[in-house]
Amino acid sequence: MLSSKYISVSFLLLSLSLHAVNCADPLYHFCFSQESYTATSRYGTNLNGLLNLLSTKVPSKGFGLSSTGQGQDRANGLALCRGDVSKTNCTTCVIDAGKELGNRCPYKKGAIIWYDNCLLKYSNIDFFGEIDNKNKFYMWNVQDVENPTSFNPKVKDLLSRLSNKAYANPKFYATGDLKLDSSSKLYGLAQCTRDLSGLDCKKCLDTAISELPNCCDGKRGGRVVGGSCNVRYELYPFVDA
């Protein structure tokens, strides 16, 4: 059963055409911690250090995690860039994400934000290696396909193949396409954060795929976006080769 927060995010994004999303704009965010800190606190200092560290550590491999500080003042964080994103664009996205979370979730100890090019998450609680099933939202194209009965199984087939491909890839990332007819293709993406095990990556992706009917039946494009993995399909290419 979906939480009210989950549903509200989905309805908020109902009118969004995915093709028009600006890569520089955040897709969504959650300020998920009820705990706060002050600008001069140890946690605030540790968080600033963590964000600086991630902005230099992540771009070379497209993913990174780190912790700064000790005990209750420890700041834990990770960032993930989409598998096709350049080092320069990854750096820009991670830096922008840290600044934007500071504006949108001021002095909250735990928060997460997504862009087309990256995600960033931090918390005073160690969340590494655990599937994040709480911070999640849907996006879909408002346009419908002509024949959803035949289209929906093809979406599931493509993304299921990409799930199998992604969890076997050290980068936990896969893209691909499926020919629909002589003039059109279906394009897909599956990606996990690399703190997960391979089996947990597949579990996360398969769960995301199973949730597509909640938002995206018969839609020309759709996404299930979470804190540990995301899947996406479109009728146009949306990643760099």
Swiss-Prot record:
Signal sequence annotation: 1-23
Keyword terms: Antibiotic, Antimicrobial, Disulfide bond, Glycoprotein, Plant defense, Repeat, Secreted, Signal
Entry protein name: Antimicrobial ginkbilobin-2-like protein
Taxonomic path: Eukaryota, Viridiplantae, Streptophyta, Embryophyta, Tracheophyta
CDD domains, alphabetized: Gnk2-like
Biological process annotations from GO: defense response to bacterium; defense response to oomycetes; response to oomycetes
Domain Gnk2-homologous: 25-127, 133-238
InterPro entries the record matches: CRR_secretory_protein, GNK2, GNK2_sf
Residues carrying sugar: N89
Family: Belongs to the cysteine-rich repeat secretory protein family.
Gene name in the database record: GNK2L
Compartments reported by the entry: Secreted
PROSITE patterns assigned: GNK2
Swiss-Prot/TrEMBL induction comment: Accumulates in response to Phytophthora cinnamomi infection; this induction is rapid in resistant cultivars, but delayed in susceptible ones.
Disulfide pairings: C81-C90, C93-C118, C192-C201, C204-C229
